[in-house]
């Protein structure tokens, strides 16, 4: 084992974490400048491993923590890692090995802490010390670690100090501790023996005094014995008399009880009847309350609503009938007016039809006369123009040129007229198509307004609206009925909820408040945590049904177990219990089914074999199979018997519980429990049954209420749907009516467009006629010019032309006359036609349209709709009348039911009053029996008290000897016995100062004397053993010192010869009474234990006085000198030799030397270095030095650097180490 690694942090000058790794298991040398921190490194190791830094004060701990610039350091720690492949260190319990042959010891110190850690586990310093001792590192050896100054101190040590060092190595302190403890115990033994001797003297004196008291006590006891005999005889006679009187009273009591049984049975029957009548009366009152509060009010409200509805229907029927009559009258009036207007229109149209042919004829004649006149005028103009134009020309060519130009113009004009005609023809064709399209659109619009599809659609809408309104009325009636039903159910639910709460209170009264709160909170927690009902089943009492005959048995056996909550698993129970604990919600007991098992050992005996009639209670309990374990767990070992005595036998024999129908029970241990049970007092099972029934009814009504509310939601949805459908159909109907109005507007627009088209067509026709006329004129003029080209040139008109000109004048005049006559006739006819058209278009036709529109709006569909509405209202009236009849009947029925309930209530109250009166009479009779029984019981109680007093007095007399009961004093009366007893009491009173504890005290003190004698003997034996132990301890100390000194002396001589080959040295131990000059002889120590033992047990005698050193450095034969006579370097050699000799006696696995060669001469430094090299083969050495001698033989080298007041350690090689020593120390080689 050796030190492998040292980690220092915050310790003295080592501020930062400093890791010194890779120590050699042999020799290691640490170098560094003065003040760099070498000694602090050794102090760090001593801080962990030695006692030098134990029990540190706050100031001392603060001195170990680095104090420097920069951030403050709050703690210091040193960690030493040992390489222990042989596992020589035995780790304390609880500390695990790392598995890498390393053991880590760490000590951390702060201002308020001082902790040790071993392999990262907190341990005590004692654990560290014991572990190091197992590895050979002893705290008794002060030279495993040799700091600076230790060599100098040993060099200048006195003989006594060297002896103390030798004793420390031996472990003499432990001998001294044991020796002091033995001497202390020896002294305590002497004190105890003196005290015992003193007590023995006092006891002997006391015993002599007690002998006289003992004799007086014997006389007193004899008198007391006779007195007890007399007392016993008197008490026994009186006790027999008391017992005889009690037996007579018991007979009277039994007779009285037997006589009252008939009345008690009758009282039980009356109790049952009163209970039944009370329950029935409560039920009647609840029903009557519901009838009055709900049924009657709803019936009245319904009758009132239906009456009001019937009145509203009658009013609506009257209104609709009036609308039908008014619309029919107006329709007849409008029809007559329309017929008259149509007749007038027809007359005007017939008149127009008669005038129009003449108008057309005159129009054609006028056009023809105009054309003729225009033609004649054009010819006249042409001839006149020809006369004037031709006069301008001088030759034919000039004329012809002009004519050709005119011909070209006329041809161009004719062509334009032809083109215009084609365009006008096309326009006329387009207008005619538009006219036809407008005619078709007008027909379609008329069909859309008055066609059968539209009328049928409106009729369908009206029919559907009637159906939907009827459906809506039915739904509203249904909703009202559901509302009434809901109100009734809510009233019933409130009543049932009150019953549930009352039954819950009744159940709670049978248990503790904490348990009641717990059961209520369990249900809340189950709902809150959403635990399945298949996991929490309820209380055991709710899960079973018991025959009424055996209900008392189940009640007594079940007890509080009836309120235990049955769950599926313990996980469920734990979950609920944790929540109960969190909310402080009471206490409950759970029965997890998965933790129960059926007891196969339960075997009921056969009725035939036992000849005792019994019934297993479990057979009278009904439950679901899944709860079998829980039910059998509580009731499975119980049998019901008629007689408790026989049941007790069965219970003991078969390890069962037996119970009677009255509730008296016996368990398998023979314990009997019983007494009076009030059969009419509400029991737990009955309360649980009533609670379950009320909850069941409440749940049923709640489900019905939920069903009604769901139906209400459905009917509300249905009503919304019907209202939606009504709105949709109404909107569709309004949409159709709106479309009809749009169609009418479009029809008027189309009619106006038709008139405009007619006017446009007439204008085009006039244009075409005018165009034909112009084209005819142009063609004639063209023909004239072409004809003129063929004539000879003449500037004057020809004779024919002149005659034609004159003829034309006459023809024009005649044409004018004809045109004027025709125009005048046409104008008169046109005026008449315009007047007729204006009357038709402006007056008659609009009136016709208005009346037709009005009659269309208020047409057959509207009338039919009103008629349908009237039929619907009449049907509704019939339905409402039937509803009214039913409502009246229902109101009468409810009133009759209420009257019946009131009558039944009155009868039951009378019956209850009668039963109560009879009950009072029975109770009075029983009260008389009770008073008689009480008097008997009072007498019996007095006698029982007297009997107990007599029995107590007899017991106080105690046991009497058998010879005392031989004489029964039958020939002596009680008075005589009493006189003898008084005389004896007088004699006893004379001995009232006798010590009644004399026998006991004498015996006690005698035993005390024997005990003291035994203790004195034991103390003598203990004293002898302690004296033997003291002798042995002294002898062991002397032997240990002698043995260790011999070893150290031999090692010292050998080591000194290695260091100083030419010299010699030896150790001399001095014993008391030795002559001071006898230093030249080695002493052979022989201690005589007997002669050195002090008489008072104190170790005041010192065997040895010191250890001195005798040496010679030049010759083995020269006179040797004492160490005080040597030089400083020679003293250091002796000190080192002594340290190494001590270490060889108690070898350790590692050693630390801090500059042990500082004061040595050159030759001795080399010898020490060589010796350490040899010793390092079996142990690890870590040394500091300022010389090069150790560097020549060491294995590892480390340098301590000091910068910015902070120490660090680095590893260097041999050359770097030697170079540093030579460079920093000019005496390195000296």
From Swiss-Prot:
Residues 172-482, 685-1041 form a coiled coil. Keywords: Acetylation, ATP-binding, Cell cycle, Cell division, Chromosome, Coiled coil, Mitosis, Nucleotide-binding, Nucleus. ATP binds at residues 32-39. The modification N6-acetyllysine is found at residues 112-113. It is found in: Nucleus; Chromosome. CDD domains: ABC_SMC3_euk. Pfam families: SMC_hinge, SMC_N. SMART domains: SMC_hinge. One of its GO terms (molecular function) is double-stranded DNA binding. One of its GO terms (cellular component) is mitotic cohesin complex. One of its GO terms (biological process) is meiotic sister chromatid cohesion. Residues 1078-1097 are annotated as: Disordered. InterPro entries: P-loop_NTPase, RecF/RecN/SMC_N, SMC, SMC3_ABC_euk, SMC_hinge, SMC_hinge_sf. Acetylation at Lys-112 and Lys-113 by ECO1 is important for genome stability and S phase sister chromatid cohesion. The keyword Ligase does not apply. Residues 535-651 form the SMC hinge domain. SUPFAM superfamilies: P-loop containing nucleoside triphosphate hydrolases, Smc hinge domain. Involved in chromosome cohesion during cell cycle and in DNA repair. Central component of cohesin complex. The cohesin complex is required for the cohesion of sister chromatids after DNA replication. The cohesin complex apparently forms a large proteinaceous ring within which sister chromatids can be trapped. At anaphase, the complex is cleaved and dissociates from chromatin, allowing sister chromatids to segregate. Belongs to the SMC family. SMC3 subfamily. Cohesin complexes are composed of the SMC1 and SMC3 heterodimer attached via their SMC hinge domain, MCD1/SCC1 which link them, and IRR1/SCC3, which interacts with MCD1. The cohesin complex also interacts with SCC2, which is required for its association with chromosomes. The flexible SMC hinge domain, which separates the large intramolecular coiled coil regions, allows the heterotypic interaction with the corresponding domain of SMC1, forming a V-shaped heterodimer. The two heads of the heterodimer are then connected by different ends of the cleavable MCD1 protein, forming a ring structure. Present with 2660 molecules/cell in log phase SD medium. This is Structural maintenance of chromosomes protein 3. The gene is SMC3.
């Amino acid at each position: 084992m050796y030190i492998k690694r040292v980690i220092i942090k915050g310790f003295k000058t080592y501020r930062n974490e400093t890791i010194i790794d890779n120590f050699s298991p042999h020799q290691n040398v640490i170098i560094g400048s003065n003040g760099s921190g070498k000694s602090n490194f050794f102090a760090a190791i001593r801080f962990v491993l030695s006692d030098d830094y134990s029990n540190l004060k706050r100031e001392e701990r603060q001195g170990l923590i680095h104090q420097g610039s920069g951030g403050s350091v709050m703690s210091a720690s040193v960690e030493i890692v040992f390489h222990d492949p042989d596992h020589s260190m035995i780790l304390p319990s609880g500390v695990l090995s790392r598995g890498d042959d390393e053991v880590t010891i760490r000590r951390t110190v702060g201002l308020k802490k001082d902790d040790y850690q071993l392999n990262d586990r907190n341990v005590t310093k004692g654990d560290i010390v014991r572990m190091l001792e197992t590895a050979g590192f002893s705290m008794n050896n002060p030279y495993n670690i040799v700091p600076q100054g230790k060599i100098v101190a040993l060099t200048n040590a006195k003989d006594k100090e060297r002896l103390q060092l030798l004793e420390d190595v031996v472990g003499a302190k432990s001998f001294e501790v044991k020796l002091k403890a033995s001497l202390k115990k020896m002294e305590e033994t002497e004190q105890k023996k003196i005290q015992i001797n003193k007590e023995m003297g006092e006891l002997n004196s006391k015993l002599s005094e007690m002998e006289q008291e003992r004799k007086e006590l014997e006389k007193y006891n004899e008198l007391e014995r006779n007195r007890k005999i007399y007392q016993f005889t008197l008490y026994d006679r009186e006790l027999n008399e008391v017992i005889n009187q009690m037996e007579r009273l018991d007979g009277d009591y039994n007779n009285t009880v037997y006589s009252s049984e008939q009345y008690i049975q009758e009282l039980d029957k009356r109790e049952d009847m009163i209970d039944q009548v009370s329950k029935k009366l409560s039920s009647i009152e609840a029903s009557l309350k519901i009838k009055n509060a709900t049924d009657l009010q709803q019936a009245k409200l319904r009758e009132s609503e239906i009456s009001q509805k019937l009145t509203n229907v009658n009013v609506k029927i009257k209104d609709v009938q009036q609308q039908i009559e008014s619309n029919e009258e107006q329709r007849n009036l409008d029809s007559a007016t329309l017929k008259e207007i149509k007749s007038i229109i027809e007359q005007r149209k017939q008149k127009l039809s008669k005038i129009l042919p003449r108008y057309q004829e005159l129009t054609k004649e006028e056009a023809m006369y105009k054309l003729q006149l225009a033609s004649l005028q054009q010819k006249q103009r042409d001839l006149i123009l020809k006369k004037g134009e031709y006069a301008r020309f001088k030759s034919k060519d000039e004329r012809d040129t002009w004519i050709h130009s005119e011909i070209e113009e006329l041809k161009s004009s004719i062509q334009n007229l032809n083109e215009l005609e084609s365009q006008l023809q096309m326009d006329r064709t387009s207008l005619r198509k538009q006219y036809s399209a407008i005619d078709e659109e007008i027909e379609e619009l008329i069909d859309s307004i008055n066609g059968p599809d539209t009328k049928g659609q409106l009729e369908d809408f009206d029919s559907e609206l009637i159906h939907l309104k009827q459906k809506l009325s039915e739904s509203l009636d249904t909703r009202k009925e559901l509302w009434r039903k809901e109100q009734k159910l809510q009233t019933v639910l409130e009543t049932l909820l009150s019953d549930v709460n009352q039954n819950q209170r009744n159940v709670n009264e049978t248990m503790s408040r904490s348990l009641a709160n717990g059961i209520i909170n369990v249900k809340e927690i189950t709902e809150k945590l959403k635990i399945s009902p298949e996991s929490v089943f309820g209380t055991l009492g709710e899960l079973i049904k018991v025959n009424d005959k055996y209900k008392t048995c189940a009640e007594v056996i079940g007890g509080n177990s009836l309120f235990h909550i049955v769950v599926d698993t313990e996980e469920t129970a734990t979950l609920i219990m944790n929540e109960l604990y969190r909310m402080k919600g009471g206490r409950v007991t759970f029965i997890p089914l998965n933790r129960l098992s059926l007891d196969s050992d339960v075997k009921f005996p056969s009725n035939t074999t036992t000849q005792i009639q019994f019934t297993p209670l479990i057979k009278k309990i009904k439950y679901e199979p899944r709860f079998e374990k829980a039910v059998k767990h509580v009731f499975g070992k119980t049998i019901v018997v008629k007689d408790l005595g026989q049941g007790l036998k069965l219970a003991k024999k078969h390890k069962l519980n037996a119970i009677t129908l009255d509730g008296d029970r016996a368990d398998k241990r023979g314990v009997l429990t019983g007494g009076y049970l009030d059969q009419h007092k509400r029991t737990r099972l009955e309360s649980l049954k009533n609670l379950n029934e009320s909850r069941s009814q409440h749940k049923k009504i709640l489900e019905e209420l939920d069903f009604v509310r769901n139906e209400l939601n459905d009917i509300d949805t249905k009503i919304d749907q019907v209202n939606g459908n009504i709105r949709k159909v109404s909107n569709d109907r309004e949409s159709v009516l709106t479309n009809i109005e749009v169609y009418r507007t479009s029809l008027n627009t189309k009619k106006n467009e038709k008139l405009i088209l007619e006017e446009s067509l007439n204008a085009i026709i006039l244009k075409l006629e005018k165009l034909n006329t112009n084209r005819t004129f142009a063609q004639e003029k063209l023909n004239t010019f072409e004809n003129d080209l063929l004539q000879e040139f003449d500037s004057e008109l020809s004779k024919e032309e002149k005659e034609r000109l004159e003829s034309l004048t006459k023809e024009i005049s005649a044409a004018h006359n004809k045109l004027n006559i025709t125009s005048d006739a046409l104008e008169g006819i046109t005026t008449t036609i315009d007047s007729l058209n204006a009357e038709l278009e402006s007056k008659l036709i609009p009136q016709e349209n208005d009346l037709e529109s009005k009659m269309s709006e208020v047409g057959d569909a509207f009338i039919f709709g009103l008629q349908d509405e009237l039929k619907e209202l009449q049907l509704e009236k019939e339905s409402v009348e039937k509803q009214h009849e039913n409502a009246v009947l229902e109101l009468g029925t409810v009133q009759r039911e209420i009257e019946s309930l009131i009558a039944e209530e009155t009868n039951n109250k009378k019956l209850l009053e009668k039963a109560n009166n009879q009950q009072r009479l029975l109770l009075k009779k029983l009260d008389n029996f009770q008073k008689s029984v009480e008097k008997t019981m009072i007498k019996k109680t007095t006698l029982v008290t007297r009997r107990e007093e007599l029995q107590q007095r007899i017991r106080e007399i105690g046991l009497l000897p058998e010879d005392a009961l031989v004489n029964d004093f039958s020939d002596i009366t009680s008075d005589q016995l009493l006189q003898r007893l008084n005389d004896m009491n007088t004699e006893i009173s004379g001995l009232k100062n006798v010590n009644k504890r004399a026998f006991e005290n004498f015996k006690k003190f005698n035993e005390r004397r024997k005990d003291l004698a035994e203790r004195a003997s034991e103390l003598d034996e203990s004293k002898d053993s302690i004296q033997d132990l003291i002798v042995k301890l002294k002898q062991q100390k002397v032997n240990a010192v002698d043995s260790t000194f011999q070893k150290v002396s031999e090692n010292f001589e050998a080591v000194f010869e290695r260091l100083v080959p030419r010299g010699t040295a030896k150790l001399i131990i001095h014993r008391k009474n030795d002559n001071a000059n006898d230093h030249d002889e080695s002493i052979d120590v022989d201690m005589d234990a007997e002669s050195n033992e002090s008489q008072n047990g104190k170790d005041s005698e010192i065997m040895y006085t010191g250890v001195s050193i005798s040496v010679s450095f030049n010759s083995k034969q020269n006179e040797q000198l004492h160490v005080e006579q040597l030089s400083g370097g020679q003293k250091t050699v002796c000190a080192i030799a002594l340290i190494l000799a001590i270490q060889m006696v108690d070898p350790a696995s590692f050693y630390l030397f801090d500059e042990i060669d500082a004061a040595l001469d050159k030759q001795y430094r080399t010898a020490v270095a060589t010796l350490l090299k040899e010793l390092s083969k079996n142990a690890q050495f870590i040394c500091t030095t300022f010389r090069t001698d150790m560097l020549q033989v060491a294995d590892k080298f480390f340098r301590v650097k000091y910068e910015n007041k902070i120490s660090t350690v680095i590893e260097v090689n041999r050359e770097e180490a030697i170079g540093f020593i030579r460079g920093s120390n000019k005496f390195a080689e000296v």
